[in-house]
């Protein structure tokens, strides 16, 4: 790869398949605007063709459980350009045939989303400004003061003024409700989310009791309350094998150089 060809360098991710349908996310750097361009490509008659592209970024495609509908995240690309002060606008859209409808929209980042096993709901993980910081117009120029500096950082950069939330979206009515409130529980970020028999389990970061570092925890949502089932390790990438919950990571925090492992709960 020569320097003059860097504009053509793309990375591929989020490959999804259903029957003979394939969709993949392609991301490249646009150096003139200093921003990432993310598009969706679809396999059609043996050839890859652009499925979603334009002035917005498109990412994280998923096929519906019981139909041929396609979901994806659409993000205002100006959000990626830090020199612009436009508010973030992220939404999940659903394409059914040639019809496109907005399923969920938020002023903030959509980190991931999960289709319920019955196909009736979406569970959306977001990263939003906390209540105290949300109404500050020029957030980049606002000074920030910290009594403690946590050891770990998440991938979003300014984590101290962000909170992770989970919304439940009814695909039939279009209505949504916040089922995990990051402001209430002081959740800095949410990494992984799974559902089994209608019960949500997720891994998340929050400050320890002294406020000196971030701790990874795994919690289950029961009657709108978070019940922690694992607190001493560094776990993420939750998944079910059969009806048993598994996680990828370390049994004990900072247990280096122990190899990453898969643990069954």
Where does each model-flagged region fall?
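Solenoidal tandem-repeat scaffolds enriched in leucines and small polar residues
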Residues: 130-134, 158-216
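Multi-bladed beta-propeller domains
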Residues: 1-11, 41-59, 85-111, 169-189, ...
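Predominantly five- to eight-bladed beta-propeller fold
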Residues: 38, 80-89, 127-167, 214-217, ...
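A generic tandem-repeat structural signature
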Residues: 67-99, 133
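Short glycine/acidic-enriched loop and turn motifs that connect beta-strands
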Residues: 28-32, 76-81, 129-132, 206-210, ...
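Conserved beta-propeller blade repeats
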Residues: 8-22, 55-73, 79, 107-125, ...
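Beta-propeller domains
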Residues: 25-50
């Amino acid at each position: 790869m020569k320097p003059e060809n860097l504009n053509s360098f793309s990375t591929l991710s989020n490959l999804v398949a259903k029957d003979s349908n394939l969709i993949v996310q392609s991301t490249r750097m646009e150096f003139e605007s200093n921003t990432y361009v993310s598009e969706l490509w679809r396999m059609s008659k043996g050839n890859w063709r652009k499925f979603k592209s334009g002035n917005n970024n498109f990412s994280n495609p998923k096929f519906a459980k019981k139909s041929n509908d396609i979901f994806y995240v659409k993000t205002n690309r100006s959000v990626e350009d830090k020199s612009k002060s436009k508010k973030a606008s992220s939404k999940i859209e659903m394409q059914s045939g040639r019809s496109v409808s907005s399923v969920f929209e938020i002023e903030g980042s959509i980190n991931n989303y999960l289709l319920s096993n019955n196909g009736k709901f979406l569970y959306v993980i977001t990263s939003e400004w906390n209540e105290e910081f949300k109404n500050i117009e020029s957030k980049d120029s606002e000074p920030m003061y910290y009594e403690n500096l946590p050891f770990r950082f998440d991938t979003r950069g300014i984590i101290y003024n962000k909170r992770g939330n989970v919304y439940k979206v009814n695909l039939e009515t279009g209505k949504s409700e916040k089922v995990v409130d990051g402001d209430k529980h002081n959740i800095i970020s949410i990494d992984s989310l799974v559902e089994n028999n209608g019960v949500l389990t997720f891994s998340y970061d929050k400050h320890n009791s002294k406020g000196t570092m971030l701790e990874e925890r795994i919690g289950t949502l029961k009657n709108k309350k978070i019940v922690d089932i694992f607190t001493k390790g560094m776990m993420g990438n939750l998944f079910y094998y059969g009806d048993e919950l598994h996680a990828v990571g370390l049994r004990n925090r900072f247990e280096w150089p122990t190899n990453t492992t898969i643990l069954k709960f």
